[in-house]
Structures are given as structure tokens and as C-alpha cells.
């Protein structure tokens, strides 16, 4: 519901007679009536006018972003969206978005806006919700802005699709705790004073650092890395020490991103829409911790559309990877959640990024068959009896395919050859 113009360029001198708490009461009423008529369906409604507590009933967005008289000059408005979205998260409104492309202004020259459009899409892919929207009948489909812009927009959108298992796990955390997915740096690193001056970058969950380019013509980005070791997510074998500012390359096809050493990132295949496939292989990217430490992630899943998640109908799959002097010990924990089960069989895929290539792999003490990448990927969505691994020294990855039976398994990747 749109209660008035709200693009930061003009505000009415007199209010229209509605209070913000009137809006939240309206959204509460709409949610209750929807659920009354659809007792096992989730409601989705969105507003920019509400009151404290709106997260119980609706989602927010930042209002109409004004591009100005010339839409190609909307860089400042795009940059402003990051601190606004972060502020919303701090206000316990974890699910928010902005008008990706900037709402206001006619687009008369699509090629002239291609760079700005690309950066909008790249930044918007890391909104908790992503929504491309422009006023009137102005079309903003990616292919209108030229072949390069379309290609770059497609890559950003597909990246978000791949990250949906990661995002959905953090959506559950937001539901339980109020912690937002899109986080100011200081929320994760409150003791580091430098993080309080980083309003052009943010944490996406606890593992990923995202620094979108928001300046016209920029092909690099000044990024602050807090404590720890950070791996360039666009070049996953390049690592940097933390507690430093650095300038990273950011051509038009690149979103500056870093993953913290000691992280596990679950991913799904790219799809045309989120539930195109009811069950699919989940890939866990593993960036091992330093020797003697371990990496953990607990994947959250539920049916996605009904209210079963409120009744305990969900499951978690805990994954742990310990780094030892002998190699890596991967533990797939027992799947928890008796009230929800997968709608079909699937494989779990693991990709460990390592320069120390294991020579032997054991599953629960028994040697695993070694194969090549092609064989490992073959029929992974239809064949659920194959357990195999593939060390790839050239790519610096150690790959594993494991049928998901919901049980605990210990996989040892050993740096030396052993005979069993």
C-alpha cells in the first residue's frame, strides 16, 4: 500500500490523516484474514509505511528511490540504499529490499544506463529480498540494456539462486532471533572500530563479506577486511590477512566478495524459479580453518510454502570439517527433524578448497573410490548409490559425492597413501 510519495526528494507539509500504527494494524488484519482463509499457507505482503513490530506481519522496502531528472545520475541513491537496509536490519526488520534500478525517472537511453543498471542488480542480489522495480510503464528487463549488461545481470541473479540454501538458513535464524541476514560490519565485529566507518560494504550472514561497487566508472573497490583470513570469493585460492583496508579489482562483471577462512557455504543448482525442482543435490563449499580448528554449518530446510515450520516441521543437517596435520576430517551429522522429510532422494556434494591435495579418502573407515570430475557429476540428480571422490590439483579442489541417507558419516581426507 502506497500512502504517499517517499523518495527523499519531497515530503508533504501536512500528514494525510493516517498514523503509522494505523498501517500496522491494517497489515495485521490482512495477515490474519489471509491465514483464516488459507490456514496452511504463508502470507507475503510488503510495505514502506508501518510501525515498530511490522516484521510480525509484513516486509519492508525503502520507498521510491529518486534517480533525479536524469536516471543515469542515480548513483548516489543506489549507494544510499546500503545504510538504509542495514539500519532496517538493526531495527529488527530483517527482511527488506529496495527498488532495484531506482524507481523514479523515465529511461530514455538504455545503453547509457547499462553500467548503473548492472551495479544496481549486483547490489540488489544481496538484499534479503530482491525486487527489480521502476515506475509507470518503464521496462527494466536485463536484455534492454545491452548484451554485456544482460550477461552480468544474469550472473548476479544466478549467484543469488545458488546461495539460496545459505540464505534460507539465515532466514530461519532471523525468524528465531531477529538477527538480519544483511549485517553492518560492526554487528559481527563490534570491537573493531574501523568497522563503524564501512557503510558501503556489509556481512551477508557470518561467513560472506560483500562490497558492491556504487560509484560511476569505478573498476575497483576499497574494502576493509576485519580480523581473520579472508578468501576472495571470485578467486577462491587468493587469501588476505584481515585488519586492513585494501583495493580490489571490480570490473563490470565482478561483485567484490570475500569468504572468511573456516566457512562452509551451502549451494543449490541454478533454477528458473525457486521450487522448479522439489529436491536437488546440495553442494557444500568448504574453506577449511587453520590446522587444529574446525569449520561448521547447520543447513536448515523446510517445505517452503506452508506453516509447518511453526509446528516443528523442518530439518537440519550439521556439517563439520576439522583440519588436522594428516588432512581433513569431514563429519556429516545425523539429520535432525522427525516431522519433516525430503520429498525424494538426493546427493550431497562437497568441494574443499585446498592446496594440500589428499591422496586417500575414507568413508567410515573404508576407502572411497577415486574418479574424475565428469564421472563425479554424472547423473547426480538421478543416481543415488554412488560414493566417490576426486582430488583436482589443477583446480585446487577436493570433491566428494555422497548419497544423503540422513545418517552420520565420517569422511577422512588423508594427505598420505594408506593401504586397507
Model-derived regions, located:
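Short conserved micro-motifs at the rims of enzyme active sites and ligand-binding pockets
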Residues: 57-58, 106-110, 131-132, 221-223, ...
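Soluble, non-transmembrane domains of envelope/secretory-pathway proteins that act on or interact
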Residues: 240-280, 286-288
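Conserved small/polar residues in nucleotide/adenosyl-binding loops
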Residues: 418-420
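Surface-exposed beta-strand/loop patches in extracellular or lumenal glycoproteins
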Residues: 217-226, 338-357
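Catalytic-domain carbohydrate-binding cleft regions of carbohydrate-active enzymes
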Residues: 1-254, 259-260
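Short, well-structured beta-strand segments within conserved domains
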Residues: 328-330, 361, 404-415
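Edge strands and adjacent loops of beta-rich recognition modules
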Residues: 268-339
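Solvent-exposed beta-strand/loop surfaces of large extracellular or lumenal domains
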Residues: 233-252, 362-397
Amino acid at each position: 500500500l502506497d500512502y504517499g510519495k517517499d523518495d527523499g526528494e519531497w515530503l508533504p507539509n501536512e500528514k494525510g490523516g493516517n498514523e503509522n500504527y494505523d498501517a500496522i494494524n491494517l497489515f495485521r488484519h490482512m495477515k490474519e484474514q489471509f491465514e483464516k482463509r488459507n490456514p496452511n499457507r504463508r502470507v507475503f505482503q510488503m510495505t514502506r509505511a508501518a510501525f515498530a513490530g511490522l516484521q510480525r506481519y509484513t516486509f519492508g522496502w525503502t520507498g521510491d528511490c529518486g534517480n533525479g531528472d536524469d536516471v543515469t545520475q542515480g548513483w548516489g541513491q543506489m549507494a544510499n540504499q546500503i545504510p538504509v537496509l542495514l539500519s532496517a536490519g538493526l531495527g529488527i526488520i530483517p527482511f527488506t529490499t529496495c527498488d532495484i534500478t531506482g524507481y523514479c525517472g523515465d529511461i530514455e537511453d538504455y545503453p547509457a544506463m547499462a553500467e548503473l543498471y548492472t551495479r544496481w542488480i549486483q547490489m540488489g542480489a544481496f538484499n534479503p529480498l530482491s525486487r527489480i522495480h521502476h515506475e509507470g510503464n518503464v521496462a527494466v528487463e536485463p536484455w534492454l540494456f545491452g548484451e554485456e549488461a544482460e550477461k552480468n545481470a544474469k550472473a548476479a541473479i544466478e549467484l543469488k539462486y545458488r546461495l539460496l540454501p545459505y540464505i534460507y538458513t539465515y532466514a530461519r535464524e532471523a525468524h528465531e532471533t531477529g538477527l538480519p541476514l544483511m549485517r553492518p560490519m560492526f554487528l559481527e565485529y563490534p570491537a573493531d572500530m574501523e568497522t563503524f566507518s564501512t557503510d558501503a560494504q556489509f556481512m551477508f550472514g557470518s561467513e560472506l563479506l560483500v562490497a558492491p561497487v556504487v560509484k560511476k566508472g569505478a573498476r575497483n573497490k576499497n574494502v576493509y577486511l576485519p580480523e581473520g583470513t579472508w578468501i576472495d570469493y571470485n578467486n577462491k585460492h587468493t587469501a588476505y590477512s584481515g585488519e586492513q583496508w585494501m583495493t580490489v579489482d571490480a570490473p563490470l562483471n565482478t561483485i567484490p566478495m570475500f569468504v572468511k577462512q573456516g566457512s562452509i557455504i551451502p549451494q543449490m543448482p541454478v533454477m528458473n524459479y525457486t521450487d522448479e525442482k522439489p529436491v536437488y543435490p546440495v553442494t557444500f563449499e568448504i574453506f577449511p580453518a587453520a590446522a587444529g580448528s574446525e569449520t561448521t554449518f547447520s543447513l536448515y530446510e523446510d517445505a517452503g510454502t506452508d506453516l509447518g515450520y511453526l509446528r516443528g516441521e523442518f530439518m537440519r543437517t550439521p556439517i563439520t570439517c576439522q583440519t588436522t596435520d594428516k588432512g581433513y576430517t569431514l563429519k556429516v551429522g545425523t539429520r535432525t527433524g522427525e516431522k519433516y522429510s525430503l520429498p525424494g532422494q538426493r546427493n550431497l556434494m562437497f568441494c574443499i578448497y585446498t592446496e594440500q591435495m589428499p591422496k586417500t579418502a575414507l568413508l567410515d573407515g573404508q576407502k572411497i573410490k577415486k574418479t574424475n570430475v565428469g564421472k563425479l557429476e554424472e547423473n547426480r540428480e538421478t543416481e543415488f548409490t554412488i560414493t566417490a571422490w576426486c582430488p583436482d590439483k589443477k583446480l585446487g579442489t577436493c570433491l566428494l559425492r555422497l548419497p544423503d541417507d540422513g545418517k552420520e558419516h565420517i569422511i577422512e581426507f588423508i594427505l598420505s597413501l594408506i593401504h586397507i
